[in-house]
Each structure stands twice: as C-alpha cells, then as structure tokens.
Amino acid sequence: MKRDANTWNEILIQCRVKPFTAANWAAVFAQEIGADTFSKGESEIDDFLGQILHESALLEKMEEGLYYKTPGRLMAVWPSRFASLADELPYLRNPEALANKVYGGRMGNVRAGDGWRYRGGGLIQVTGADNYRALQQSTGLPVYEKPELMRQPGAVCLRAAIAWWERNIPDSIMGDTTRVTRRVNGGVIGLADRMALTDEANRALA
C-alpha cells in the first residue's frame, strides 16, 4: 500500500512523534516507503519504524551525541582513550575535538578532521569514513562526499536507513523485536521502548 503524506503524518503522530516533526517528515516517508520497499513487504514496516524511532529519539536526533561536560564520563565511555581527568579536559564541551580524538586514525578516518566529518549520523547511525564510503558505493547516495546529509531530515537519511536495514536484518527474524534489536544495537538497550514503538506502529499502519 502506498500511503500519502497526510496518512504518514497521522501514523508518525500515533507513534509519539511530535506534530511539527511529523509534518517535516511525512512527505519523505510517503515518497520513500511503499509496499515493495522492504523484502517482506508491508509486514516489515512496523519493525523498521519501531527501531528507527527509538534510535533517532522519535526523529529528533540523527547525530551522535558527543557533547560531554561531566568530569569522569569520558573515562567511563572510552577508558582506553582517557586515563585521567586531566586527559579529559580538552575534550569536555568540545564535541569536534572529541570526535577527532576517539575516531581519528581508524575506520578509514585518515585525514585531519575525518573523525568529526564522519561521526555517527543517520536514523540508524553510520560511523567512520569506511562505512560512509561503503554506503555510498552500495546505494549511490552521496553520503561519503556529503556526510552532513546523514544528519539532516530528508530522503537521503531515510533511504540510507532502509538500505542498511535490508542488508543487515534478515527476513527470518522479522517480528522478533529482541533479535532485531540485537542486530541494530549490538545489545538490547531500550528494548522495552522499541517493543512499544513497534506495537504502536503496527496499530497505526493497520
């Protein structure tokens, strides 16, 4: 079934998305998602929505949060990178410097500033120049050349999430939110909310 923007606006609102945000995204969802978008068709859309809505804080956040201000927090998150409070000081309240510190020199980030340039972005986050490049090569989306597109509401961001989903989530686990979450998250962080959002999406799509 191909849903129009008004229908998608209502679906997103029923899934707890703020009305202003839903209005900004509705036409994009209407354009990009139809009955044949996913390999399992309509039955897969609720699983997809449940995950991307949780991952993006209900379509409000498409960028990795790298603003830290509490001493000791960086040591807890990246213990191999920060051995002392003194090590942390230049990177507190300095997300660009932090991204270059923790991501520079790996994941294909070889140029100065690549850690920040290719920080986590997207409805399902992609991190690192190698992963942005691979996504561009597999989809044709210009996300390696213009990584900022992954951090902005729009068709590129949604298409990238769909492409990642189709490559990484096998049809055999659809409907099993716990197993799907492990694929998306690497664990089960936020599982209860993901389950609730998947159920809400299922009802809204009916």
Label every PLM stretch briefly.
Residues A155-L158, R167-D171:
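Proteins synthesized as precursors that undergo proteolytic processing into mature forms
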Residues A27, Q31, D46-L49, R159, ...:
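Solvent-exposed, polar/charged alpha-helical surfaces in well-ordered, non-transmembrane soluble domains
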Residues Q14-D46:
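N-terminal carbohydrate-binding/catalytic regions of secreted carbohydrate-active enzymes
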Residues E42-A57:
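Active-site-adjacent structural elements in enzyme catalytic domains
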Residues K2-N24, L53-A160:
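Peptidoglycan-targeting cell-wall enzymes and recognition modules
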Residues I52-E55, G128, M174-G190:
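Acidic helix/loop microenvironments that form the catalytic cleft of cell-wall polysaccharide enzymes
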Residues D4, S39-E44, W116-R119, G175-D176:
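Extracellular/periplasmic catalytic domains that process cell-envelope and extracellular macromolecules
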Residues S172, R183-A206:
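Low-complexity, Gly/Ser/Thr/Pro-rich intrinsically disordered linker/tail segments
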